[in-house]
A protein has these predicted regions:
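N-terminal flexible/basic segments that precede or flank functional cores
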Residues: 1-53, 111-113
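Short acidic alpha-helix initiation/capping motifs at coil-to-helix transition points
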Residues: 51-54, 64, 76-79
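Short basic helix-loop element that most often maps to the first helix and adjoining turn
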Residues: 58-72, 101
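Secretory-pathway ectodomains
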Residues: 59, 80, 103-107
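Key DNA-contacting residues within the recognition helix of helix-turn-helix
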Residues: 60, 74, 85-86, 95
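Short alpha-helical DNA-recognition segment
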Residues: 67-85
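DNA major-groove recognition helix of helix-turn-helix/homeodomain DNA-binding modules
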Residues: 93-114
Length: 114
């Protein structure tokens, strides 16, 4: 998956509230460049489902994946503790790109290769 396609799909996943709708809408999309008579790759549905899940992880989900306390997570990733607390309680929102980076850095999401 190219970086450009990944960014397109991530943005689309953020905009769609229902996982199944996202997967069905994008699994047969022309963005993949499949030949008209080609079979869909077996892993595409799983890839799209995992990407949607990652787009909808909260910062708390990501932190809890690590098993770290708020203070330890904030220290490890150089995030002001108050900022992390605000994100977790919904007083402020963590930018989507930062949630994605943290999900990848912590292993909560592994981006597909290729």
């Amino acid at each position: 998956m190219t970086d450009k396609l990944f960014c397109t799909l991530f943005a689309a996943a953020l905009a769609v509230a229902d996982r199944d709708t996202f997967v069905s809408d994008w699994s047969l999309s022309s963005v993949w460049g499949d030949a008209p008579d080609a079979d869909m790759p077996a892993d595409r549905i799983d890839t799209l489902a995992r990407l949607w899940d990652a787009a909808h992880l909260t910062i708390r989900d990501i932190r809890q994946h690590t098993g770290l306390s708020q203070a330890a997570f904030a220290t490890r990733y150089c995030i002001p503790t108050r900022t992390l607390e605000d994100w977790e309680r919904g007083a402020r929102s963590c930018p989507d790109y930062l949630r994605l980076l943290l999900a990848q850095a912590t292993g909560a999401y592994q981006r597909p290769r290729g």
